[in-house]
A protein has these predicted regions:
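A short, solvent-exposed beta-edge/loop patch
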Residues: 72, 82, 113-152
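An anionic, turn-rich surface loop/hairpin at beta-sheet edges
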Residues: 97-122
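A short acidic-to-branched-hydrophobic micro-motif
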Residues: 76-87
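Bacterial N-terminal signal peptides that target proteins for export
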Residues: 1-3
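Bacterial signal peptide processing site
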Residues: 17-20
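C-terminal motif of bacterial Sec signal peptides marking the signal peptidase cleavage site
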Residues: 11-15
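Short, compositionally biased low-complexity segments enriched in polar/charged residues
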Residues: 44-75, 118
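Short amphipathic alpha-helices in soluble, non-transmembrane regions
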Residues: 93-101, 143-150
């Protein structure tokens, strides 16, 4: 069943777009904090500005707010990147996230990490742009929580 859900979720996210009028009163940090509180990432570490720019290709000038968390445990997938882009900067942020995804695929050492990275998609919801690399046991729940939080 989880495999079927993953296939269905992947097909939903192909094209990466939803209505451009989707928005939320929450910040990207607040959305990510709620996902982290739900324990969807084991031993999460928050990524700060310098590292976000250098390692995660994020131009801080393009964003209103962002949150990046990565697991400190290996092996195993555990990465969430949620960005609330400034108006007119969604495509730039999405392009940055595509670079992150390519890096994650290239850096994947364990088969489970590689599979998760290869099946991941970038989601765009209004000004929110997100990338989740989570194990299949929690991915659908985390994405549902994200969607519930980012839509009014």
């Amino acid at each position: 069943i989880s495999g079927l859900i993953l296939v269905m979720m992947s097909s939903v996210f192909v094209g990466c777009g939803k209505s451009s009028d989707v928005s939320s009163d929450l910040t990207a940090k607040e959305v990510a904090a709620k996902i982290i509180e739900a324990n969807y990432i084991v031993a999460p570490m928050e990524i700060e500005d310098d590292m976000a720019e250098e390692m995660y290709h994020l131009n801080i000038d393009d964003v209103e707010d962002y949150a990046i968390y990565e697991t400190q445990r290996s092996p195993g997938p555990g990465f969430i990147m949620i960005v609330k882009a400034k108006d007119g900067k969604v495509e730039d942020v999405k392009n940055s996230m595509e670079e992150v995804l390519a890096d994650k695929i290239g850096q994947a050492f364990y088969p489970a990490e590689q599979e998760v990275a290869e099946n991941a998609t970038i989601e765009v919801d209004g000004n929110f742009v997100s990338l989740f690399l989570l194990n299949s046991e929690v991915e659908a729940d985390a994405e549902k929580m994200y969607n519930d939080l980012t839509q009014k």
